[in-house]
Amino acid sequence: MNFYPFHIGDYISHTSHLSNEEDLAYRRLIDLYYQTETPFRKNLTFLARRIKSTEETVALILVEFFEETEEGWRNKRADEEIAKYH
């Protein structure tokens, strides 16, 4: 996807507790998720390098905002938007 809806109020209410580094990692992970339209593989090193963050930060964000499945890490809201797109 080249575009996805961004709801500022929802974003702020769900992420206001994050540090600047965590906030940036979350935004980059969401952007990457929409760009690839697939669950993230379970490889913290790969994801951290892709978004220029640390494995520790990526792990914190994945646990809080994504769901670990057999297919990899999924984001429910992004999956719903991607399904609407197709």
List each language-model region with its residue ranges.
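Detector for short helical micro-motifs
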Residues: M1-H86
